[in-house]
Amino acid sequence: MRRINLNTAEPEFDKSDPEGYRAAQLKVAPVIGGETMAGGYYVVPPGEANCPYHYESDEEWLLVLEGRITVRHPEGEDELEAGDLVCFPAGPAGAHKLTNTTDAPARMLIVSTANLPAVAVYPDSDKIGVWTPGRIDNIMVRRESGVDYYDRET
């Protein structure tokens, strides 16, 4: 049995993340041998978010492990605390942004289905991201750059 202890795990920061989105992350599924589920363990410093407001083609569950996190969602904002578990359904109803508005770090675990290709929509910036198996055809585009289904086919 493969396992990870989140109390001693050390997520890493991506130095390319811009200010406001600097959260440490550890992808946990590969560590424990997950194949059909995905998971991320995050440590979000004060004043930072883990990613922009978005919704996905996968269902996600958020468990706050320590601290408090403010969740922006389609109905407004809510502050979650350690022990709170919420579900973000696939599609627009599951849109969310997770921001630490406190003065102490927040630790959280996000678990989701792992359907590929994965699609995320970013309503604030009107972007759509697609992630494919092997990541060879990943793309991030603005909605206005879309083309007709039969473009260049006939």
Residue ranges and their predicted role:
Residues 59, 63-70, 74-75:
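Glycine- and acidic-residue-biased ligand/ion/polar-headgroup-sensing regions
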Residues 90-117:
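Ligand-binding loop in jelly-roll beta-barrel domains
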